[in-house]
Regions:
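Glycine-rich phosphate/pyrophosphate-binding beta-alpha loops
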Residues: 1-5
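Histidine/acidic residue-rich metal-binding segments in metalloenzymes
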Residues: 6-127
């Protein structure tokens, strides 16, 4: 989850953290992005000379968030813990949350105002 070489948590860390949250009665929070895939795409873009802000959305196609959201939700479901997903920005992630909630799973999603008001064109703006 999240950012490779920074704050990425592997699945074993997620499992241990979710278990600890369950023991404490806390709700785990996840920023759902497949960090390995983002890192791979970033390297490919850099090799192509795409190094400006426009590379940001190109390195994060919607599947990157959808897959990670699905994985986090399934881990939480298996362990019986609620889950709070932050910065939800794709239909794929929303679909995963909606599906889980439809089954009665305590999964919540948060969106940033910018995700509701802006699109990827802001990364191509010369200003």
């Amino acid at each position: 989850m999240a950012y490779k070489n920074a704050i990425m948590a592997a699945d074993d860390t997620l499992v241990a953290s979710f278990e600890r949250c369950l023991e404490l009665g806390a709700v785990p929070t996840v920023h759902a992005e497949n960090g390995e895939l983002v890192y791979h795409l970033q390297r490919k873009l850099m090799a192509q000379g795409i190094t400006g802000p426009e590379a940001h959305p190109l390195s994060r196609p919607s599947q990157v968030e959808g897959e990670a959201a699905s994985r986090a939700i399934r881990i939480a479901e298996t362990l019986g813990t609620p889950l709070y997903l932050v910065h939800v920005s794709t239909k794929e992630a929303l679909d995963e949350i909606t599906y889980a909630r439809g089954k009665g799973q305590p999964v919540y999603g948060e969106v940033l105002a910018g995700h509701l008001l802006l699109d990827d064109s802001v990364y191509r703006d010369p200003d």
